[in-house]
């Protein structure tokens, strides 16, 4: 009878633990990193008819072997790779969208200003002495310069924003590396099959998921489940053997980002950190292109205006000053100083200015630049789909 009671008690105890495990699974179904657990049970071998051997073994009930986590290593690895690629694409796209907004006519009015400049020049060909039209011409010049300054300021803020975001993400990445090493220490001490071990393994996987979404990492595991983590591709050690090697980020003067570990360059090609680097490269390219375009526009329009004569017969003055998009400024001119005339007549220079309008004029080049930016955003959006 006592044997039957013992067998029954072991069964009740085992299934009570099993129900508790099921409850944990239900409660943590949406918890990041949590893996479904299963209680492993085995037959408990009872006593035999001899203290030296068990020729006639009696049943002994149920023994609890431990907790098993239901995980698929291949699926987890594939999920982390997919997550890294998705985060890179999404992060890059978010900054390219912001660049498109900064360059849009709704934000800076450059395209509207250029169109207005040529439209007013056309109107001045019919009425070159009209002071209202002359004032409108100068206002369009000021609008163009203001638009370039606005766009430059927006891009500067984006560069600062990306740099700040990268610094914050690197800090979080390094904090997670430190936390992962603490998990390693705990796993080496944990009893195999225990709830504590399962919880540590869950937290380990959660941290690896986070790290993989930020940068490419390659984990390997020892018999205790402790992880050695290396950077994907380069193989640089990040965590392992009681060592944690934090990464760092540096911004160049133009805003481009570079990463390093242990003082050596670290190439990151996936994850949100890669997306930030690609976004920073795009912003830097756009800032340089905006400066070049502003300078070229100013030189081209200045040369065209200086080729004419104003209402008093004086040579035309430059319309713009400044050497970059951020410093481009409309020159202080009066309506009488608009150089509408040239040697061919009182409206000759406005006719010449209008004739510039074509495939390579400032208006067309700006439209082409916006189209290229839109194509870059479209490509990034397709990658993010």
Task: Go through the PLM ranges and name each one.
Residues 1-385:
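S/T-rich, low-complexity, solvent-exposed segments of bacterial secretion/appendage proteins
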